Amino acid sequence: GLFIPCYVDALYPEVGVATYKLLTSLGLDVTYPLKQTCCGQPMANAGFEKMATDISRHFDDLFKEFDYVVAPSASCAAFVKFYHPRLAKGNHECLTSKKTMDVVEFLHDVVKPTSLKAHFPHIVSVHNSCHGVRELGLSSPSERQVPQFNKIIDLLKLVDGITIREPERKDECCGFGGMFSVEEPDVS
């Protein structure tokens, strides 16, 4: 099942469309449940635990039959994966948390493409999101002394013509922080 987070739906709908097109171009059977809403993270972050719990239950009911739940958002995928079970508190099964993945994680670890039908003759910079790095393990965090890896760059290297340049501080916080950037733009 394809989960399009509320902020993607409202602010960046082209990302949802591009995710759908990418997955189907790889021959995957993609379903977009029309009754999806949100993962509940904005409500949980604002302290509305009951509302977040109700949303997580709806999410689980909507996506539990799928083999995978794929989202173009590391933050939302991480929230479903790690926080939905906490919200459930044993009151419902929370079947989706183990099968929810960010689109990069899904492509890199499950689909494992060896080529992409894409040509992009441009220089791109890759900034790794905090949730992607530290919760989902999409790349190695710079503050830890571990072997370097980057699943995003591994996938981008499959695109013909692309040149990848990482910024000097490639995984330092960008300030977005989900709703924090909307509610506190000057601090963010």
Show where each model-derived region lies.
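Iron-sulfur cluster-binding electron-transfer modules in prokaryotic oxidoreductases
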Residues: 1-188
